[in-house]
């Protein structure tokens, strides 16, 4: 995957001086043990680092300032071992600009009935310490994540891991840069939007570059690099010449590889992590990037067609959250409305990411009427089965809104010999009719990101971090 930086999360434990130095030493010892065992569990995608026992407004404020300016720190996990007066947390929490997880847990997972005394009660006050702390977060309208349960349970560790992925995506969002080659498809409404507001709210930079600038990079790719990649791909994918001559198949496939290298170099040299193309503006290119775009998406670059920069940025963002697993640019295309068979066939002209392929992708070359260029090479495959979420973002003028519904992914009932593209069949879990009407009522777009690796809870957490309206259509 296109790499993100190495992140860590800081663990801050709440207490106070009221209980004495011996108790505070026990608090620190227990907190460090929790951190060590969380890291040793191998369930978390990023390391946790014990930072301090928070006892005063001053040291809480100082640690939150450190979190803000340390680019390596993706967020804070707090735990109240004892009672920790929440007035001490006000200033630091107000200043915190990164994701906050309140882990409402206890060092032991049981009550030691035979030995419990008031010393034990003073030390293990998470039950009401968490309530004091949660109140001030609610009072400050912090919208932070809360996970309650025993820290050693695998289910709780999985919840922490999912939140970590969201927090890292949030941090990485402010570095997402989208290059749009040409503008969006003419006269289309839903792919438009306020780029300035997107940069203010999400950190997304969206830049226009002319196709001629890309053509220079594409033409500069060496034949040696293209030939080497072509031979490598023969080992990973099925090459199907079909009705094409061997010469045409090889030339058209190699041209897509040329576009792949050209796009990749263009983006890497300028710091872009997502891109869009537009079939209406391909001057100087032999083909609409198809296989090229699919190869780049497989590496973790965000993409959307027709100049849809919002979906391209969202694709990159959710790929980060999913570690680039089974998370793809998608488009609703055609419907099965037979009773008992209701489904949506999703696809695009060419550009669907092979990370959801249920079979070995085939490299094929076929005509594409749209765009007026040479027959483009593309990956052809059938999508996977399983639970997924279909996500889109739209700009309503006064706000951005994120929306999704849960879907069941299925394979197509039959092959589609006259539709040589990547495709995915799915049905909204609430039923096609209810899902469609909910989506249309909200004005959700036709370009989406479909993911088998993230869920609606993570989308809600992400929206809370951004202060973004999120609708989970049910």
Curated annotation (Swiss-Prot):
Organism (species): Pediococcus pentosaceus (strain ATCC 25745 / CCUG 21536 / LMG 10740 / 183-1w)
Function text: Catalyzes the conversion of L-arabinose to L-ribulose.
Alphabetical list of InterPro entries matching this protein: Ara_Isoase_C, AraA_central, AraA_N, AraA_N_sf, Fuc/Ara_isomerase_C, Fucose_isomerase_N/cen_sf, Lara_isomerase
Short name of one Pfam family: Arabinose_Iso_C
Signal sequence extent: none
NCBIfam families per the UniProt record, alphabetical: PRK02929.1 (NF002795)
The protein's name in its UniProt record: L-arabinose isomerase
Keyword tags: Arabinose catabolism, Carbohydrate metabolism, Isomerase, Manganese, Metal-binding
């Amino acid at each position: 995957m296109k790499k993100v930086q190495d992140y860590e999360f800081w663990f801050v434990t709440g207490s106070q001086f009221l209980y004495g130095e011996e108790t505070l030493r026990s608090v620190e010892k227990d907190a460090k043990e929790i951190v060590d065992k969380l890291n040793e569990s191998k369930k978390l995608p990023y390391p946790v680092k014990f930072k301090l026992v928070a006892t005063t407004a001053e040291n809480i404020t100082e640690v939150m300032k450190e979190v803000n300016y340390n680019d390596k720190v993706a967020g804070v996990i707090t735990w109240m071992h004892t009672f920790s007066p929440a007035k001490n947390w006000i200033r630091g929490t107000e200043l915190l600009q990164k994701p906050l997880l309140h882990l409402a847990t206890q060092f032991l997972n049981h009550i030691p009935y035979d030995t419990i005394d008031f010393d034990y009660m003073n030390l293990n006050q998470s039950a009401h310490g968490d309530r004091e702390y949660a109140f001030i977060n609610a009072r400050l309208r912090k919208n932070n994540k809360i996970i309650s349960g025993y820290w050693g349970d695998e289910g709780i560790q999985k919840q922490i891991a999912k939140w970590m992925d969201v927090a890292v995506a949030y941090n990485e969002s402010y570095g997402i840069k989208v290059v749009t080659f040409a503008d969006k498809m003419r006269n289309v409404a839903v792919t438009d939007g306020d780029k300035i507001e997107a940069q203010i709210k999400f950190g997304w930079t969206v830049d226009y570059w002319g196709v001629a600038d890309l053509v220079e990079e594409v033409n500069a790719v060496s034949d040696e690099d293209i030939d080497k990649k072509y031979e490598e791909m023969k080992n990973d994918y099925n090459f199907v010449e079909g009705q094409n001559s061997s010469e045409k198949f090889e030339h058209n496939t190699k041209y897509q590889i040329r576009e792949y290298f050209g796009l990749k170099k263009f983006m890497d040299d300028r710091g872009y992590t997502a891109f869009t193309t537009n079939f209406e503006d391909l001057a100087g290119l032999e083909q609409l990037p198809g296989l090229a775009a699919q190869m780049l998406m497989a590496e973790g670059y965000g993409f959307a067609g027709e100049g849809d920069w919002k979906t391209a940025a969202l694709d990159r963002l959710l790929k980060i959250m999913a570690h680039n697993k089974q998370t793809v640019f998608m488009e609703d295309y055609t419907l099965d409305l037979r009773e008992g068979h209701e489904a949506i066939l999703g696809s695009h002209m060419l550009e669907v990411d092979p990370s959801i392929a249920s079979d070995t992708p085939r490299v094929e070359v076929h005509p594409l009427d749209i765009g007026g260029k040479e027959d483009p090479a593309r990956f052809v495959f059938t999508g996977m089965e399983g639970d997924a979420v279909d996500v889109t973002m739209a700009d309503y003028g006064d706000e951005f809104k994120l929306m999704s519904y849960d879907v069941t992914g299925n394979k197509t009932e039959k092959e589609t010999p006259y539709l040589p593209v990547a495709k995915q069949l799915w049905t909204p879990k609430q039923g096609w009719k209810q899902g469609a009407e909910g989506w249309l009522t909200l004005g959700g777009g036709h370009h989406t990101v479909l993911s088998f690796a993230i869920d609606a809870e993570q989308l809600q957490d992400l929206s809370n971090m951004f202060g973004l309206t999120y609708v989970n259509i049910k």
